[in-house]
Each structure stands twice: as structure tokens, then as C-alpha cells.
From Swiss-Prot:
SUPFAM superfamilies: 4-helical cytokines. Its main location: secreted. It comes from Bos taurus. Zn(2+) binds at H66, D224. GO terms for biological process: cell surface receptor signaling pathway; female pregnancy; mammary gland development; positive regulation of biosynthetic process; positive regulation of lactation; positive regulation of receptor signaling pathway via JAK-STAT; response to nutrient levels. GO terms for cellular component: extracellular space. Belongs to the somatotropin/prolactin family. InterPro entries: 4_helix_cytokine-like_core, Somatotropin/Prolactin, Somatotropin_CS. This is Chorionic somatomammotropin hormone 2. It is found in: Secreted. Glycans are attached at N70, N92, N146, N160.
């Protein structure tokens, strides 16, 4: 198992006031430049309005991450109830998660000790790492016998939510995108393992799907937790 990547060379000390000011000024500057307007002195009313807009963006992302985890949990429970009753799939489920090599923090208290850059990196690492599995999962689920349309619909919605959450993190923390992609490519298992998920043995196939749903539920909880921490810091309510 590969060691967890270190971000010590990229530390960013969290300062909510300074960080918010810089981001808001950048937003205003970009908007005015695009319109060909010289930047006026920004009054307090404009600052408050832009700060509220930024907070609203994070609140919406937190709501989306909550739905992302909730739907992942519902999908896992539906699959577990229909296919895994009386089976022992859960014994090895945790060990088989393809994101295990990243050693992302499981508990909130540990996640809260991380700065914003590291939290956003781990969020994007998890979301990117699920792009490939979700793509192939949707292809294979449509071929499963007696699988409810609700599960397929949930998987499609989860993929859509993941893309929206990725866009949110990318827009707020642009400089982390390249390091995150590099980190993921160094762990080839996150990209190559799911290129073929078709198995001749039905029990093995169900076991693999069970593991996927289990790991997705676990990782979506982490994503939800990280984004909510980022949101409460932006709102200064932590």
C-alpha cells in the first residue's frame, strides 16, 4: 500500500478574514476587467454583498455534498437488502476500497486539524478517484438481472452530483488541480482497476458491486464532512 502523500511543502495557514478579502477582491477585479471598467474603490456594501455571495456558494455545496452522501447510503442499503442478505461480503469490504492508499482522515476532529488547502485536496482526490468506477459501474448495472431502476437512477444522479462537487472545488481552489491529478496518477489502481467489471461468476460480481457501493458510501461521507468544514470556516461558525 502506497504511503499517504504529504502536503507539507504546500502549507497554507487558514486565515478566514484575509482569505475572504483576497478572494472577494479577485472576483470583483475579474468581473470589472471583463467589462472593460476600471476598478473603483469598493465600498463596504459591495464587500458585504460579495461576501454573502461567497458564503451562499459554500452553503449550496454543503447541501449538495449532504445529498451526495445521503443518496450513496440509500443506494448501498437498497443493494444490500436485495443482494447481500445472508452473505459475508461486508467482512472484506473496507479492505478492498480503491481509495485506501490515500489514507484520508476518517474522523471529523482529525479533518478539522487540516488547513483549507489540504482539505480541498483530499476532497478532490476522492471525487476524481470515483470518476472511473462510477462510469463503469453505470455501464454494468444496466446489464444486471432484476436490478431496480431506482438503483440505476441513483447511480446516475450520484455521478452528476460528483461532477458538480468537482466543479465547485476546482473553481474555489484552482491551484490544487494539477497536484491532485498527479497524485492520483501515481496510484494507478484508482484508474485501471475498473476498466473491466464483468465476471462470469455471479456471486463474485455481486461481491464486487457490494464493495463498490460500500466504499462509495464511506468516501461520500468524507467528502460531505470536508466540504461542511470548509463551509463553516467560510461562515466563521466553526
Amino acid at each position: 500500500m502506497a504511503p499517504a502523500p504529504s502536503f507539507r511543502g504546500h502549507q497554507w495557514t487558514y486565515n478566514p478574514v484575509r482569505g475572504s478579502c483576497l478572494l472577494l477582491l479577485l472576483v470583483v477585479s475579474n468581473l470589472l476587467l471583463c467589462q472593460g471598467i476600471s476598478c473603483p474603490s469598493c465600498g463596504p456594501d459591495m464587500f458585504v454583498s460579495l461576501q454573502k455571495s461567497l458564503i451562499d456558494v459554500f452553503i449550496n455545496a454543503a447541501s449538495l455534498s449532504h445529498d451526495f452522501h445521503n443518496l450513496s447510503t440509500i443506494m448501498f442499503n437498497e443493494f444490500d437488502e436485495k443482494y447481500a442478505q445472508g452473505k459475508l461480503y461486508y467482512i472484506n469490504a473496507t479492505k478492498s476500497c480503491h481509495t485506501n492508499s490515500f489514507h484520508t482522515p476518517e474522523e471529523r476532529d482529525k479533518a478539522q486539524q487540516m488547513n483549507n488547502e489540504d482539505l480541498s485536496k483530499w476532497t478532490l482526490v476522492l471525487l476524481y478517484s470515483w470518476n472511473n468506477p462510477l462510469y463503469y459501474l453505470l455501464l454494468e448495472l444496466r446489464n444486471m438481472k432484476n436490478l431496480s431502476e431506482a438503483v440505476i437512477s441513483s447511480a446516475m444522479e450520484i455521478e452528476n452530483m460528483s461532477e458538480k462537487l468537482q466543479a465547485f472545488i476546482e473553481s474555489q481552489f484552482r491551484k490544487i488541480i494539477v497536484p491532485v491529478l498527479k497524485m492520483i496518477h501515481e496510484v494507478s489502481d484508482t484508474w485501471s482497476r475498473f476498466s473491466s467489471m464483468t465476471f462470469s461468476d455471479e456471486d463474485r460480481s455481486i461481491s464486487e458491486y457490494y464493495n463498490l457501493f460500500y466504499c462509495l458510501r464511506r468516501d461520500s461521507r468524507k467528502v460531505d464532512m470536508y466540504i461542511k468544514i470548509l463551509t463553516c470556516r467560510t461562515r466563521k461558525t466553526c
